[in-house]
Amino acid sequence: MFLVCFGTRPELIKLYPIIEEFKNKKIPFKTLFTGQHKDLITQFINLSGRPSFTLTDIMKHNQSLNSLLSKMLIKSDPILKKNNFKIIVQGDALSSFAMALSAFNNKRDVIHLEAGLRTNDMFSPFPEEANRIMISHLSNIHFCPTKRSMENLSKEGIKNNTYLVGNTIVDSFSLITNKFKI
Protein backbone atom coordinates (compact mmCIF):
# COMPACT_ATOMS: atom_id res chain seq x y z
CA MET A 1 0.00 0.00 0.00
CA PHE A 2 1.15 3.53 -0.74
CA LEU A 3 1.37 6.41 1.72
CA VAL A 4 1.20 9.79 -0.01
CA CYS A 5 2.89 12.37 2.25
CA PHE A 6 2.53 16.14 2.11
CA GLY A 7 2.88 19.14 4.38
CA THR A 8 3.12 22.19 2.13
CA ARG A 9 0.90 23.74 -0.52
CA PRO A 10 3.23 22.89 -3.45
CA GLU A 11 3.39 19.26 -2.30
CA LEU A 12 -0.39 19.00 -2.12
CA ILE A 13 -0.88 20.61 -5.53
CA LYS A 14 1.67 18.35 -7.21
CA LEU A 15 0.53 15.16 -5.44
CA TYR A 16 -3.16 15.76 -6.14
CA PRO A 17 -3.06 14.02 -9.57
CA ILE A 18 -1.42 10.97 -7.98
CA ILE A 19 -4.13 10.80 -5.32
CA GLU A 20 -6.88 11.14 -7.93
CA GLU A 21 -5.30 8.48 -10.16
CA PHE A 22 -5.04 6.08 -7.21
CA LYS A 23 -8.74 6.66 -6.48
CA ASN A 24 -9.79 6.22 -10.12
CA LYS A 25 -7.80 3.00 -10.52
CA LYS A 26 -8.73 1.73 -7.04
CA ILE A 27 -5.08 1.47 -6.01
CA PRO A 28 -4.85 1.12 -2.21
CA PHE A 29 -3.31 4.19 -0.57
CA LYS A 30 -3.46 6.40 2.47
CA THR A 31 -2.44 10.01 2.98
CA LEU A 32 -0.31 11.62 5.66
CA PHE A 33 -0.40 15.35 6.37
CA THR A 34 2.70 16.46 8.27
CA GLY A 35 1.05 19.62 9.58
CA GLN A 36 3.72 21.96 8.25
CA HIS A 37 1.16 24.32 6.64
CA LYS A 38 -1.86 23.93 8.93
CA ASP A 39 -4.19 25.90 6.65
CA LEU A 40 -3.85 23.18 4.00
CA ILE A 41 -6.00 20.71 5.85
CA THR A 42 -9.24 22.43 4.84
CA GLN A 43 -8.11 22.69 1.22
CA PHE A 44 -7.16 19.02 1.19
CA ILE A 45 -10.48 17.95 2.68
CA ASN A 46 -12.28 19.99 0.01
CA LEU A 47 -10.27 18.25 -2.74
CA SER A 48 -9.82 14.69 -1.51
CA GLY A 49 -11.37 14.11 1.90
CA ARG A 50 -9.78 13.85 5.31
CA PRO A 51 -6.14 12.65 5.43
CA SER A 52 -5.63 9.15 6.82
CA PHE A 53 -2.96 10.44 9.23
CA THR A 54 -2.21 13.94 10.53
CA LEU A 55 0.86 14.79 12.58
CA THR A 56 -0.33 17.20 15.28
CA ASP A 57 1.44 19.94 17.25
CA ILE A 58 4.29 20.14 14.75
CA MET A 59 4.56 23.87 14.15
CA LYS A 60 5.73 26.30 16.83
CA HIS A 61 6.57 29.97 16.43
CA ASN A 62 10.29 30.60 15.71
CA GLN A 63 11.29 26.95 15.98
CA SER A 64 14.46 25.75 14.33
CA LEU A 65 14.53 23.47 11.30
CA ASN A 66 16.00 20.75 13.52
CA SER A 67 13.13 21.07 15.96
CA LEU A 68 10.57 20.79 13.17
CA LEU A 69 12.40 17.87 11.57
CA SER A 70 12.69 15.97 14.84
CA LYS A 71 8.97 16.39 15.57
CA MET A 72 8.02 15.04 12.15
CA LEU A 73 10.39 12.08 12.56
CA ILE A 74 9.13 11.23 16.05
CA LYS A 75 5.44 11.56 15.14
CA SER A 76 5.68 9.62 11.86
CA ASP A 77 7.77 6.78 13.28
CA PRO A 78 4.93 4.76 14.89
CA ILE A 79 2.85 5.04 11.70
CA LEU A 80 5.66 3.67 9.55
CA LYS A 81 6.65 1.00 12.07
CA LYS A 82 3.10 -0.34 12.16
CA ASN A 83 2.40 -0.26 8.39
CA ASN A 84 4.39 -1.58 5.45
CA PHE A 85 3.78 1.44 3.24
CA LYS A 86 5.62 2.51 0.12
CA ILE A 87 6.18 6.19 0.86
CA ILE A 88 5.57 8.83 -1.82
CA VAL A 89 7.15 12.26 -1.30
CA GLN A 90 7.28 15.23 -3.62
CA GLY A 91 9.90 17.91 -4.13
CA ASP A 92 12.26 19.34 -1.58
CA ALA A 93 10.33 20.60 1.45
CA LEU A 94 11.47 19.65 4.93
CA SER A 95 8.33 17.50 5.25
CA SER A 96 9.44 15.47 2.20
CA PHE A 97 12.91 14.97 3.64
CA ALA A 98 11.47 14.04 7.05
CA MET A 99 9.17 11.42 5.56
CA ALA A 100 11.91 10.02 3.31
CA LEU A 101 14.27 9.72 6.27
CA SER A 102 11.59 8.20 8.49
CA ALA A 103 10.77 5.70 5.73
CA PHE A 104 14.44 4.82 5.26
CA ASN A 105 14.91 4.35 9.01
CA ASN A 106 11.92 1.97 8.98
CA LYS A 107 13.18 0.10 5.90
CA ARG A 108 10.30 1.31 3.75
CA ASP A 109 10.55 2.08 0.05
CA VAL A 110 10.65 5.75 -0.91
CA ILE A 111 9.26 7.07 -4.19
CA HIS A 112 10.41 10.61 -5.00
CA LEU A 113 8.29 12.73 -7.31
CA GLU A 114 10.15 15.69 -8.90
CA ALA A 115 13.49 13.98 -8.35
CA GLY A 116 16.84 15.25 -9.58
CA LEU A 117 16.25 18.99 -9.57
CA ARG A 118 19.46 20.81 -8.63
CA THR A 119 20.85 24.34 -8.39
CA ASN A 120 24.32 23.00 -7.53
CA ASP A 121 24.51 25.52 -4.67
CA MET A 122 23.92 23.78 -1.33
CA PHE A 123 22.65 27.01 0.23
CA SER A 124 20.37 28.21 -2.57
CA PRO A 125 17.62 27.55 -1.94
CA PHE A 126 18.23 26.71 1.71
CA PRO A 127 17.52 24.10 3.03
CA GLU A 128 15.71 22.77 -0.05
CA GLU A 129 18.82 22.00 -2.15
CA ALA A 130 20.26 19.82 0.61
CA ASN A 131 16.84 18.19 1.11
CA ARG A 132 16.69 17.32 -2.61
CA ILE A 133 20.08 15.65 -2.53
CA MET A 134 19.38 13.68 0.63
CA ILE A 135 15.93 12.57 -0.55
CA SER A 136 17.48 11.31 -3.79
CA HIS A 137 19.92 9.13 -1.89
CA LEU A 138 17.19 7.74 0.38
CA SER A 139 14.79 6.94 -2.48
CA ASN A 140 14.27 3.69 -4.35
CA ILE A 141 12.31 5.14 -7.28
CA HIS A 142 12.88 8.55 -8.86
CA PHE A 143 10.25 10.29 -10.99
CA CYS A 144 12.07 13.10 -12.79
CA PRO A 145 10.40 16.12 -14.40
CA THR A 146 13.12 16.77 -17.01
CA LYS A 147 15.94 15.06 -18.84
CA ARG A 148 18.39 17.33 -17.00
CA SER A 149 17.08 16.12 -13.64
CA MET A 150 17.73 12.53 -14.75
CA GLU A 151 21.25 13.55 -15.78
CA ASN A 152 21.78 15.17 -12.37
CA LEU A 153 20.91 11.90 -10.65
CA SER A 154 23.20 9.97 -12.98
CA LYS A 155 26.11 12.29 -12.09
CA GLU A 156 25.46 11.43 -8.42
CA GLY A 157 25.59 7.71 -9.19
CA ILE A 158 21.81 7.19 -9.20
CA LYS A 159 21.15 5.37 -12.46
CA ASN A 160 18.53 2.76 -11.60
CA ASN A 161 14.80 3.27 -11.23
CA THR A 162 14.83 6.78 -12.70
CA TYR A 163 11.89 7.71 -14.91
CA LEU A 164 11.21 10.81 -17.00
CA VAL A 165 7.58 11.68 -16.22
CA GLY A 166 7.23 15.45 -16.60
CA ASN A 167 5.81 17.73 -13.93
CA THR A 168 2.49 16.92 -12.24
CA ILE A 169 1.70 20.63 -11.95
CA VAL A 170 0.37 20.37 -15.52
CA ASP A 171 -1.88 17.46 -14.51
CA SER A 172 -2.99 19.34 -11.38
CA PHE A 173 -3.97 22.39 -13.37
CA SER A 174 -6.07 20.29 -15.72
CA LEU A 175 -7.74 18.29 -12.93
CA ILE A 176 -8.55 21.30 -10.76
CA THR A 177 -9.89 23.42 -13.63
CA ASN A 178 -12.13 20.53 -14.69
CA LYS A 179 -13.27 19.70 -11.15
CA PHE A 180 -14.19 23.28 -10.30
CA LYS A 181 -15.24 24.29 -13.84
CA ILE A 182 -12.74 27.15 -13.96
Predicted regions and their residues:
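Residues at the starts of beta-strands that form the adenosine-phosphate
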Residues: 1, 28-30, 109, 141, ...
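A nucleotide-sugar donor-handling region in carbohydrate enzymes
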Residues: 34, 38-39, 138-182
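Short glycine/proline-enriched coil/turn segments at helix->beta-strand junctions
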Residues: 24-28, 50, 81-84, 159-160
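Conserved nucleotide-sugar phosphate-binding/catalytic loop shared by glycosyltransferases and other
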Residues: 27-71, 75
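Structural beta-sheet core signal
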Residues: 4, 31-33, 112, 164
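Active-site and donor-binding regions of nucleotide-sugar-utilizing enzymes
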Residues: 4-6, 11-21, 59-157
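Generic domain-boundary/flexible-linker signal
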Residues: 40-42, 98, 121, 173
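Short, hinge-like loop/turn segments at secondary-structure boundaries
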Residues: 46-50, 105-106, 127-131, 160-162, ...
